[in-house]
From Swiss-Prot:
It comes from Human immunodeficiency virus type 1 group M subtype F2 (isolate MP255). Residues 7-31 are annotated as: Interaction with Gp41. Residues 14-33 are annotated as: Interaction with membrane phosphatidylinositol 4,5-bisphosphate and RNA. Residues 273-359 are annotated as: Dimerization/Multimerization of capsid protein p24. Keywords: AIDS, Capsid protein, Host cell membrane, Host cytoplasm, Host endosome, Host membrane, Host nucleus, Host-virus interaction, Lipoprotein, Membrane, Metal-binding, Methylation, Myristate, Phosphoprotein, Repeat, RNA-binding, Viral budding, Viral budding via the host ESCRT complexes, Viral nucleoprotein, Viral release from host cell, Virion, Zinc, Zinc-finger. Residues 185-223 are annotated as: Interaction with host PPIA/CYPA and NUP153. The record marks 128-129, 359-360, 372-373, 427-428, 443-444 as: Cleavage. GO terms for biological process: viral budding via host ESCRT complex; viral translational frameshifting. Residues 73-77 are annotated as: Interaction with membrane phosphatidylinositol 4,5-bisphosphate. Residues 12-19 are annotated as: Interaction with host AP3D1. A motif (Nuclear localization signal) lies at residues 26-32. A motif (PTAP/PSAP motif) lies at residues 450-453. This is Gag polyprotein. Residues 8-43 are annotated as: Interaction with host CALM1.
């Protein structure tokens, strides 16, 4: 048993006895498990001394791993113990058996990925639709009907909207000029747009010929001629020549060059079909910020500008053209905020909850302002008290230190206090109220005179003038104001 137990010693044995058999369990690995593992290895015709080293444990793991699916419980337990021992030899801390198995699986996955990457690097680079056959020859695979159908469907539904360009770029990955012409020929309608595209291609082909003149003299044997603009466009070159240019050493990527020309023409077409300028994209008062960002970047994609200019438009116009609510939030974030931070901060702006919160904040500010104004007004209206005893300000008579004045503090007479003083004083109209005689000064003293306008003369009695006698008689008959004749007539 001593030989079997000598697999671990010292610190490694202590680490072995700290590892649990199951996650959260009480039982831990002991020395008896090493003895049992040695006996099981002998039963499976394996050398027990392999348990003493890291490499030996790795060999045992490789040997047992292939039999795990069909093996018994004893085999699985032996495999688990060897995996734990493998990490103990490497002095890697594991808490239980499951953690050791997870680490081993992760390690094996990384190793497999590295091997696949090495194998891929050794193989010849292959770009669809040009692939390498079994004999090692580069052959062409035509675009599938599904790819062409997807392209036609995009044109029919989107009608040269900005998202057509990335769709074309994805479908034409690695395509030859012949494949690109096939995609363009499948477009049935929009012939005006296709004519614009042809004009752009011809302009770019002429520019290519100007920048790449033909070298004088014959072409050396075994060497391909240099492609002209029409060769890149696929009108004067064969499929085999295109494949040779694309796979040669050094290669001439005629497919990628032609693809750039087409995308340049598509940008002009998208600009024509989407005349809205990026400057006109502004967020509505109640429009969600997410919808505004979608419209902004959709229009930005159609802009014919460099990436630096588009980045500047995104940093400046996206904030500048937002509504006031979002603009306040975005300016508070600062110029270095990411798009994710902007959309998170402006989420819910414009909705009923946001409006209610803004209104509550405004009302709270207005209320606090009114309270502060009231407090300040009360402070400004502080009365200045005056002492009736000495006549000085700043204290009242109760607290006056001067000798008490004798008599009434108002009239100066003795025998009564100021509250009982009958000295005449002005009423609220500013008139003196006479004491003990007559009516108060705020009552009318005389009988009011009538203030009605004189009776109008309508001209009915212009020819009749009363005689002086009648006037005198009328005056005599009029009773005095204090008489009762107006009520009882001629009653004696």
């Amino acid at each position: 048993m001593g030989a079997r137990a000598s697999v671990l010693s010292g610190g490694k044995l202590d680490a072995w006895e700290k590892i649990r058999l199951k996650p959260g369990g009480k039982k831990r690995y002991r020395l008896k498990h090493l003895v049992w593992a040695s006996r099981e290895l002998e039963r499976f015709a394996l050398n027990p001394s392999l348990l003493e080293t890291t490499e030996g444990c790795k060999k045992i793991i490789g040997q047992l791993q292939s039999s795990l699916q069909t093996g018994s419980e004893e085999l699985k337990s032996l495999y688990n113990a060897v995996v734990v021992l493998y990490y103990v030899h490497q002095r890697i801390d594991v808490r239980d058996t499951k953690e050791a198995l997870d680490k081993l699986q992760e390690e094996q996955d990384k190793s497999q990925q590295k091997e696949q990457q090495k194998a891929a690097d050794k193989e010849v680079s292959q770009n669809y639709p040009i692939v390498q056959n079994i004999q090692g020859q580069m052959v062409h695979q035509a675009l599938s009907p599904r790819t062409l159908n997807a392209w036609v469907k995009v044109i029919e539904e989107k009608a040269f909207s900005p998202e057509v360009i990335p769709m074309f770029s994805a479908l034409s990955e690695g395509a030859t000029p012949q494949d690109l012409n096939t995609m363009l020929n499948t477009v049935g309608g929009h012939q005006a747009a296709m004519q614009m595209l042809k004009d752009t291609i011809n302009e770019e082909a002429a520019e290519w010929d100007r920048l790449h003149p033909v070298h004088a003299g014959p072409i050396p044997p075994g060497q391909m001629r240099e492609p002209r603009g029409s060769d890149i466009a696929g009108t004067t070159s064969t499929l085999q020549e295109q494949i040779t240019w694309m796979t040669g050493n050094p290669p001439v990527p005629v497919g990628e060059i032609y693809k750039r020309w087409i995308i340049l023409g598509l940008n002009k077409i998208v600009r024509m079909y989407s005349p809205v300028s990026i400057l006109d994209i502004k967020q509505g008062p109640k429009e969600p910020f997410r919808d505004y960002v979608d419209r902004f970047f959709k229009t930005l994609r159609a802009e014919q500008a460099t990436q630096e200019v588009k980045n500047w438009m995104t940093e400046t116009l996206l904030v500048q053209n937002s509504n006031p609510d979002c603009k306040t939030i975005l300016k508070a974030l600062g110029p270095g905020a990411t798009l994710e931070e902007m959309m998170t901060a402006c989420q819910g702006v414009g909705g009923p909850g946001h409006k209610a919160r803004i209104l509550a904040e405004a009302m709270s500010k207005a209320t606090s302002t009114a309270i502060m104004m009231q407090k300040s007004n009360f402070k400004g209206q502080k009365r200045i008290v005056k002492c009736f005893n000495c006549g000085k300000e700043g204290h009242i008579a109760r607290n006056c230190r001067a000798p008490r004045k004798k008599g009434c503090w108002k009239c100066g007479k003795e025998g009564h206090q100021m509250k009982d003083c009958t000295e005449r004083q002005a009423n609220f109209l500013g008139k003196i109220w006479p004491s003990n005689r007559g009516r108060p000064g705020n009552f009318l003293q005389n009988r009011p005179e009538p203030t009605a306008p004189p009776a109008e003369n309508f001209g009915f009695g212009e020819g009749i003038t009363p005689s002086p006698k009648q006037e005198q008689k009328g005056e005599e008959q009029a009773p005095p104001l204090v008489s009762l004749k107006s009520l009882f007539g001629s009653d004696p």
